[in-house]
Structures are given as C-alpha cells and as structure tokens.
Amino acid sequence: MINKRFIIFIFILFISYIISFINFISNLNKDNITHVQSKTIVVITGSVGRLTAAENLINLNSEARLLISGVAKGVKFSEIIKSKSIDPKKVDLGYNAKSTFGNAIETKVWVSNNNIKDFILITDDWHMKRALLLFKNSMPNINIYPYELKSNSKSLREHLLFEEHLKYLIAHLQVIYIWFTN
C-alpha cells in the first residue's frame, strides 16, 4: 500500500512543477529585444535567425565585436557569416561549447581575456531564460543585455517549451556547481 505522505509529496511536487512551468512561459510573449548600445555581442549558435540578428547588430556599430559561441569544429568564418561587410577581425568563433552551460563558460573566458564589461546576448525566446541564468551566474559582475528572437514555428515552440523548462530546472543545479567552483 502506498504511503499517504508519499502521495501528498508527489501531489505537491506536481503542483510545484505546474507553477514553475507557468512562471517559465509567462515572459515568452513579451517583446524583449534590447535597445542598449553595446560594443560587444555574443550569439549562441542554433537557429539561423540568431546569426542574422548578430550580423544586423554588428553592422549598426562599426566598433562592435562579436563572439559566436558553440561553433562546430571545422566550421569556418565564411560558412557562418554571410555578410561581406563584416570584418573577420571583429568576430571570434568559439569552438569549445557543446551546451548552454558550455556557452556560458566559453563566453566567460572570452570576456575575461578581452576585458569586456557588458554585452548583448542573442538567442531564441524559449532559450533566453536558461541562458541568462547560466551566463549571469558565471559572470556576476558583467552586464548582460538579452536580445530575444521570437520562435516562428508554433508546434516546434510548444514541443520545445516542455523540454526547455526541464533544462531550465536542471540549469539551477549547474548554477550551484558554478557557485562552488568560483
């Protein structure tokens, strides 16, 4: 026979998850494109729209610098950046990250090596909450300005939200790891 306390615990856990999920999705439909001017841009690889947004921002600021984090091994600048007006010397390709946690660590090293105080972070709306959690905890003294791109596909978006919410919960454990290692 199942213990009554265990059933109550499972019920509380389920309700907590539902509340957490509602909180997670509550900010997704807001316009969260930053209007801050920063000379530094970080884009996490993923959708093509992320790179297009990064190209547009770097073209608006002749002094801007760009890190593309999470680039697959062997991929060259010319395969990623389609705009001929972008100076390759202003773009760094990060080949070490394999996850959002890895993107945060890769960016932390790049920020430290380049004495950067702030940057615009570009990723999709469904990914931003987790990315900001990891990036801000990896670099607490750096100002990070989110530049969220709206997801286009509704069915893909609905599927991703549940998966992304679970990853967001797991990211909290990664934050604990960051705290212990800093």
Positions of PLM-derived features:
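Short, Lys/Arg-enriched, disordered terminal segments
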Residues: 1-10, 32, 115, 177-182
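Hydrophobic membrane-insertion alpha-helices, especially the h-region
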Residues: 5-23
